[in-house]
């Protein structure tokens, strides 16, 4: 998100929440979406708190420009937060450094192993409220490349996603080079949650979800 603000890359993956800040410089591709289909960022606590109790606590979050934080604000309104690296939130809550944390990425699958409690799944909340998927991440391309090059790059990205879905084992092995040391089963489950047909094309309901979310 920060590098996109500085236009450092021609193509970048960003949080959907951050897109309005870069819309003058970047176009949102119709491929590369990460959307929660009835699941998403989770609020967890080191004890069994109700949502009302949790709202009064300081919440560890992965960033102010993350889609997870926007979903939290939409669901809970104005709350007290502190930003931590996303991979430090779950252990910090488990160790009692924070009462409540907002977890993303593989933490959505591993939180039960850390002895914490689920307070709310914001993907469930969003789906129940809107009937739409929760838009979390997207791919953007820099506008100064020109429409023709932007279109070509978007098509290349789409083809790469289609290829990875056709040969997921090879794609997962390649992706592990940039992984965070999670085990193969967790890695596969997480990828299957967020890389699917909607990653090839948002779909009309996916595009509607982005407009409503922002």
Predicted feature locations:
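Short active-site-proximal "capping" loops at secondary-structure junctions
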Residues: 1, 17-21, 33-35
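Hydrophobic/proline-rich hinge and linker segments of small-molecule sensing/allosteric domains
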Residues: 28-50, 126-144
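Bilobed "Venus flytrap"/periplasmic-binding protein-like clamshell domains
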Residues: 39-100, 106, 208-212
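Secondary-structure end/capping motifs
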Residues: 146-214
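Beta->alpha turn/N-cap motifs
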Residues: 4-20, 85-86, 103-109
